[in-house]
């Protein structure tokens, strides 16, 4: 096996607030992938850091009467506590306010300047005459210049979705002091992203080497423009004093913008790890590095990671990312996380209420599919799925069999002829087990597919144990060998399932390692043609007495969690600092909502025949910018539908998915062929989406939606 050398990062949480369940989507996703790679025997380093610079940190520290350094030290300890509580195993968790990050920020800036990619220009900004500071976009409020909505921020309107500059706001005021800002001119430093060297490189990088998911590559194509077109703008990388950050070398009162040194924090954190562990930093970051570099991020910061970051690295003489993996936002019960509803749940409150962090790790894994789709934490489904899958299916296998092994057979599994008979049973009943499929799903970050495959296998094990009924056999003393085989089989299959679930459930896996009397659960690879029975525990293996591994979720625990967050947020809510976080990934953003359409009668509605459809095939449509051609199975027949969802979905990701279609819509002759219906998708008034609708589990092709 070829050993891969891999460096993995998660986006840096901002040092201006608590970790919440939206943030945890990314860190759990990354941690699962890293643990899987380490189980494969690869050399993997996982680094992260607090993103510590910027005006919000400076102002919050001032408000609390402490230094910014004291604030970020306190928040760093809180963040690390929360991550540790959810078993996020960083190899290094650091801070961007470090000598290492400063060194690489200055080095990259110097090299870009030497390459002629730094420009100095005078810009006009809004200035707070009371606080004596230039106001970032999110620190200015006023009336939207497009629709007139009040209390809008200086960069975009949450009512109509319009984008604008702070100087365009009507009746602006400072969100810091309440003063009316004045206009002042200041020299700023720009990274010349529009330079042909950057634009040409980004165009090549986007389309070569599979660096981005298909949805991200489509978004990059929009930002870059068509071939021969350059839609990129130069990037302002400086801020004026007063500011908490790194001063630009050779300048007075000019600081690096937080988004310049934030991704450089990956390098700073890894450099710290290298110093601790004796790792060769250059082997991972030099231009011709053969190692692998992966960034896990939220889709709302794709712009910074897929445009600015690779262009900076390339032109400063460093390697660029192997791949950037972007995930979607988290909603709770189908809605944006809400403080008033108690669904803006912090990591700390989840743990303080006594909820098992591995319940959430499993639920997120069951939802994450490697795409940029949003995921929903439906709290009722959360309770049902964890109780059904983890406790009812998986843990139940061990609890049904372990007691007999300990009490009747001294903790020893079968050996000799009975072991050979057990192997035959395994190969006969579980021929459909495909560890390679699970492995491929983990590699592709399609954890939902891995979980589905594992739980199907757990169902098969439970079905066989139910058929063998060891609790019935145990009543007949003449069937001791049969009882021993049945219970040994259950423990053996539980062992294999535990190997596959270890990246998701590391704490439970550690308990199982003790229960099964193992040094460490390792990934059980099954070679082509090799029987599954070759991957079992050896004959006569001795296990320890069974200790309870996991409890069910009591719905009352969820109610208590919601109540606790409602009470806490009412006491500590600080919307001013919360809204200024430059990395708001993991939480769905505010969006304008279209007005409700004209009322129709029930008679009108029932004319629409909505059916569950399985996407059998999905293809690009030559010459079409927005369309995908879908082949849909609606139970009784197959239909061809052209859907305008190309910007959001890669065809390969759609195959096998269920969706909803209008089945009785008149066929429409299009330039590319006949469209025999319409699939349903949601989209925002400000351009968000489209988001293909999907039914709940259990729905089948052809079922009518009513």
UniProtKB/Swiss-Prot annotation:
Species whose genome carries this gene: Nitrosomonas europaea (strain ATCC 19718 / CIP 103999 / KCTC 2705 / NBRC 14298)
Role of this protein: Is required not only for elongation of protein synthesis but also for the initiation of all mRNA translation through initiator tRNA(fMet) aminoacylation.
Protein name according to UniProt: Methionine--tRNA ligase
Ranges spanned by the short sequence motif 'HIGH' region, renumbered to the chain: 13-23
UniProt subcellular location: Cytoplasm
Molecular function terms from GO: ATP binding; metal ion binding; methionine-tRNA ligase activity; tRNA binding
Domain tRNA-binding stretches: 604-706
Positions of region (Disordered): 570-593
Cofactor detail note: Binds 1 zinc ion per subunit.
CDD domains: Anticodon_Ia_Met, MetRS_core, tRNA_bind_EcMetRS_like
The encoding gene: metG
Keywords in alphabetical order: Aminoacyl-tRNA synthetase, ATP-binding, Cytoplasm, Ligase, Metal-binding, Nucleotide-binding, Protein biosynthesis, RNA-binding, tRNA-binding, Zinc
Family: Belongs to the class-I aminoacyl-tRNA synthetase family. MetG type 1 subfamily.
